[in-house]
Amino acid sequence: MIVTSKGRYALRIMIDLAQHREDGFISLKTVSERTELSMKYLEMIVGNLKKAELVQSTRGKEGGYKLVKDPKDYTIGEILRCMEDNLAPVACIKEGEIQCDHSGGCLTVPMWKELDDITNAYLDTVSLEDLLTGEKWRNKT
């Protein structure tokens, strides 16, 4: 699994909105300045986040974006899945993907499917709040 820049930047945007959630709607210009991401890229990413109903927007002078839920109620899995076509570790197990010539007898497919399940399950245990506080990883060596 390789998380693309879209997925990584979506997390940065969601973290920024979470850190400043008391400010109400936040303009993309402000998010751009704080995250050092281009406006053009931000527009594309927040469009996906809005379509997935992870953020809401309003127009006008006080317009911008904000989270629709509390940070503890977002999983990293749901954020990444709205940005990434697929988080599968190999192409042959991607949903709708054309199988390779060896898929019928491939002995590695069960392992890849299990890795995919483990990865997705883990990402669904990590919340946006976990990233904000870092508590989940404190005292781990």
Kindly give the residue locations of the regions a language model identified.
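Basic amphipathic alpha-helical segments that dock to polyanions
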Residues: 45-50
